[in-house]
């Protein structure tokens, strides 16, 4: 995948999206909704992380400035097809806040958190994939760090994004993976 094209797609959406002030309660409400949907069987594993995220949310400014506008909503590599050297995006998804930040979060779900590796059940060179993803993630991080909203809100959006997957996790391995990734984010 030519990551440059995906970055350009997101950046064009940022540039065409007006910076809009939203109430932090929109994010807090989504967090509470996600928290309530966590499988009771796994809930105890996530209590500390949930508490830390809630503290972080409560400390945020009441008004949050984000670009609101075009957003794919689920821009993971599994929703990107390459045909005749052109990128085709599939499986668009509504987001709780239509912001290009969500697309950065979803890209980094793959590059930083290696989500799509969980979906591969064939033999592959995981070490090589991890090296490539680390390179791509660094590129994405460096590129979007120029935006205040990215530096300010990426972590909390990524935490909510990963928590959102937990209710769908049936496998203990996936639950532990998500727990570890959330712990890493909490340390930043």
Give each language-model segment a name.
Residues 85-95, 137-149, 184-187:
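Short amphipathic alpha-helical segments and their helix-coil junctions
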Residues 55-102:
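Active-site acidic catalytic loop and adjacent metal/ATP-binding pocket
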Residues 102-144, 159-174:
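Active-site activation/catalytic loop segments of kinase-like enzymes and analogous catalytic loops
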Residues 20-26, 150-159:
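Acidic carboxylate-rich catalytic motifs and surrounding loops in phosphoryl-/glycosyl-chemistry enzymes
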Residues 1-19:
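ATP-binding pocket architecture of kinase catalytic cores
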Residues 14-70, 145-146:
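An alpha-helical support segment within catalytic cores of ATP-dependent transferases
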Residues 44-48, 87, 153-157, 163-188:
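Regulatory N- and C-terminal appendages and interdomain linkers associated
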């Amino acid at each position: 995948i030519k990551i440059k094209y995906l970055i350009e797609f997101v950046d064009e959406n940022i540039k065409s999206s007006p910076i809009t002030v939203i109430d932090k309660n929109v994010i807090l409400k989504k967090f509470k909704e996600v928290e309530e949907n966590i499988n009771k069987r796994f809930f105890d594993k996530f209590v500390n992380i949930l508490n830390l995220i809630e503290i972080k949310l409560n400390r945020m400014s009441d008004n949050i400035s984000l670009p609101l506008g075009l957003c794919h909503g689920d821009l993971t590599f599994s929703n990107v097809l390459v045909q005749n050297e052109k990128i085709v995006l599939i499986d668009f998804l509504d987001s709780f806040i239509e912001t290009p930040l969500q697309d950065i979060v979803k890209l980094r779900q793959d590059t930083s958190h290696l989500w799509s590796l969980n979906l591969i059940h064939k033999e592959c060179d995981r070490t090589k994939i991890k090296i490539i993803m680390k390179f791509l993630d660094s590129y994405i991080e460096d590129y979007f760090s120029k935006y205040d909203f990215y530096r300010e809100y990426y972590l909390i959006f990524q935490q909510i994004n990963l928590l959102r997957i937990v209710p769908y996790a049936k496998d203990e391995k996936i639950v532990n993976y998500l727990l570890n990734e959330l712990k890493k984010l909490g340390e930043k």
